[in-house]
């Protein structure tokens, strides 16, 4: 499988933890996500998530705010950020981590792509 990367994958990113959850985040979910991500960043883990609304977004934002590294695994090409409101966040992630996709540029964020991404 070929991976497309925007940003840098470092050796230290092998020490990573995935943080995923509901797109319809509850206030408690937001609080707990921030708490856990802060602790993982303190322990020098790279945060990996999918750039989706909700828990994924909070995980990436918290990692960046705490000075940690984060990697977003997309269900589209690197040139099509989904959801669109995370475009600025995606730019920040590419500077302080990486955007990764199994799909070439031009690939739209179709439901089947997210399902395949989640299995690989």
List the model feature ranges, each with a label.
Residues 1-120:
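Glycine-biased, small-residue-rich flexible motifs in mid-sequence functional cores and linkers
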């Amino acid at each position: 499988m070929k991976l497309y990367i925007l940003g840098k994958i470092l050796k230290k990113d092998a020490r990573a933890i995935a943080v995923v959850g509901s797109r319809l985040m509850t206030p408690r979910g937001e609080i707990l996500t921030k708490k856990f991500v802060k602790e993982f960043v303190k322990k020098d883990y790279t945060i990996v998530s999918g750039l989706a609304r909700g828990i994924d977004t909070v995980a990436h934002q918290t990692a960046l705010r705490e000075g940690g590294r984060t990697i977003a695994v997309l269900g589209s090409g690197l040139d099509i950020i989904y959801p669109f409101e995370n475009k600025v966040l995606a730019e920040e992630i590419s500077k302080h981590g990486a955007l990764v996709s199994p799909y070439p540029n031009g690939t739209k964020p179709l439901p089947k792509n997210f399902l395949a991404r989640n299995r690989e």
